[in-house]
């Protein structure tokens, strides 16, 4: 590249030739010509702390800071809720609502309460942070939230959709503080079928904050001395019933483990923690799914334009490729377009060595979920009506849905966006979601590779580090494998494999 810059000034901007820089390309007439541009920012040396992640942030054009006018608007809110606002809402502050979140979370979107009734039915209250009280349409906060579309969770930081004074402060359902919520109150019979649903604006005071690890521990070993242990057990009874009912209706069980990279302050990866979708995660998952579906049904029944979370059925050619993969393992499958056939397959491979490969193959055959103003349904969840309502602190889609729900329930004036405007919003936030997902995966991959590289340097005594692996694909150029303990995928080139004889490994 030809850098257009003042020759005398260049050493000041680029003190080291290996520095990572951000450039803008001013002219690139053809691929045969050298592009011309200018340096707009020097990130620093490649091995400087944080430069690797900054490179990803700039490459994906993610915003690093909020504009001053956005921060100013956020800081104008009082930490005290006006008394007239509290009086206009249902008061749940004396009810034992609680939260379950990751240990390092600070933006608590949701709180729950489950009560078992004498007739064997359950009442589930899902309280969601009422971000729409603070972020009004057309404000600077709203414009910025729309541009960002969602929060981005990189391996070493969060790039929030809203300023921290809201995302981690006034909107976050932290313990012991009065917080405004938009609630879905659902009643289920003993078999998990919905009896009734109502929605309300409320004020709560989070009575207890669980981490997922704490909740899991109490669910596996209840503690009579813990006042919330029994409530947690009751909640899991309902969640387990809803989960069973969901899979019977055709939902696909595609839960996959995840890896969390633990970093030093310098950004160096020191440990990897494997996270499974255990019963504490499943409990919250089922309640959020129930609330999202209830909201989608209500809005659709009121025939009000809104945003929906949609997941279309896979293309036939993708399913054909998946079927070939299944058959190559000697497994049986009927019509792969039939959810019951996929369920039967997934159940038959539980605990088997090929389970992970088959699940990955099935996920690859699926279309990507997105947002739409058309209620097209959700294939993977087997739901005709579905939306996103439960995370308005970190997703703009949920904020829009909160506004629409408030309009149809009479909580606020009834003006809401038209269909065409909503579809444009859906296209935009689907795009920002893809961008964030790409950046998140890239930052994770970067630190996983760094972890392996450091592991290799530690093993210079000649005893190489070893990891269990599975082969996903056999290609002409080598083997596409996955380290199952680290969930890292990559190609082992043919030249690196031991050869039995020419053309064979």
What are these regions (language model features)?
Residues 32-34, 47-51, 108-110, 134-137, ...:
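Short helix/loop capping segments that flank catalytic or ligand/cofactor-binding pockets
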Residues 151-248:
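Conserved catalytic alpha/beta cores of large enzymes that bind or transform nucleotide phosphates
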Residues 294, 312, 317-320, 326-505:
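Structured C-terminal cores of nucleic-acid metabolism proteins
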Residues 246-270, 286-296, 313-314, 320, ...:
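Core structural elements
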Residues 189, 227, 233-241, 277-297, ...:
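Conserved pre-motif C helix in the palm subdomain of viral-like polymerases
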Residues 1-125, 132-177, 447, 496-499, ...:
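Charge-lined substrate channels and their catalytic hotspots, especially those that engage the 3′ end
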């Amino acid at each position: 590249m030809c850098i257009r810059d003042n020759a005398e000034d260049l050493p000041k901007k680029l003190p080291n030739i290996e520095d990572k820089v951000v450039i803008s390309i001013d002219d690139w007439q053809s691929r045969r010509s050298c592009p011309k541009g200018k340096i707009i920012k020097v990130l620093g040396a490649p091995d400087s702390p944080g430069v690797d992640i900054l490179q990803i942030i700039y490459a994906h054009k993610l915003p690093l800071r909020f504009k001053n006018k956005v921060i100013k608007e956020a800081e104008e809110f009082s930490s005290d809720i006006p008394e007239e606002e509290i009086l206009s809402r249902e008061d749940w502050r004396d009810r034992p609502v609680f939260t379950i979140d990751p240990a390092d979370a600070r933006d608590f979107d949701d709180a729950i309460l489950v009560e078992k009734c004498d007739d064997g039915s359950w009442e589930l209250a899902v309280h969601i942070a009422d971000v729409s009280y603070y972020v009004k349409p057309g404000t600077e906060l709203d414009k910025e939230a729309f541009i960002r579309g969602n929060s981005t969770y990189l391996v070493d930081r969060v790039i929030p959709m809203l300023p921290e004074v809201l995302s981690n402060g006034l909107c976050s359902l932290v313990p012991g503080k009065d917080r405004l919520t938009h609630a879905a109150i659902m009643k289920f019979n003993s078999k998990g079928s919905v009896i009734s649903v109502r929605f309300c604006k409320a004020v709560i005071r989070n009575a207890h904050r669980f981490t997922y690890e704490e909740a899991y521990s109490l669910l596996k070993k209840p503690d009579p001395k813990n006042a919330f242990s029994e409530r947690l057990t009751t909640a899991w009874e309902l969640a387990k019933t809803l989960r069973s009912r969901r899979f019977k209706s055709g939902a696909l069980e595609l839960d996959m483990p995840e890896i969390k990279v633990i970093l030093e302050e310098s950004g160096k990866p020191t440990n990897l923690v494997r996270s499974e979708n255990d019963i504490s995660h499943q409990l919250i998952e089922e309640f959020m799914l129930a609330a999202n579906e209830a909201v989608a049904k209500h809005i659709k029944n009121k025939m009000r334009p809104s945003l929906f979370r949609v997941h279309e059925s896979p293309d036939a050619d993708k399913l054909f490729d998946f079927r070939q993969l299944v058959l190559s393992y000697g497994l049986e499958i009927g019509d792969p377009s039939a959810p019951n056939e996929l369920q039967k397959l997934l159940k038959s491979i539980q605990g088997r060595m090929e389970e992970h490969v088959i699940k990955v193959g099935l996920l690859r055959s699926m279309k990507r979920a997105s947002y739409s103003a058309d209620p097209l349904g959700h294939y993977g969840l087997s739901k005709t009506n579905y939306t996103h309502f439960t995370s308005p602190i970190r997703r703009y889609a949920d904020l829009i849905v909160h506004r629409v729900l408030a309009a149809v329930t009479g909580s606020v004036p009834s003006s809401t966006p038209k269909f065409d405007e909503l579809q444009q919003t859906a296209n935009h936030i689907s795009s920002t979601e893809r961008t964030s997902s790409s950046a998140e995966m890239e930052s994770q991959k970067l630190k996983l590779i760094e972890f392996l590289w450091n592991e290799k340097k530690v093993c210079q005594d000649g005893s190489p580090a070893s990891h269990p692996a599975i082969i996903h694909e056999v290609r002409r150029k080598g083997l596409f494998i996955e380290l199952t303990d680290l969930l890292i995928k990559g190609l082992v080139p043919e030249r690196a494999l031991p050869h039995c004889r020419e053309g064979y490994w």
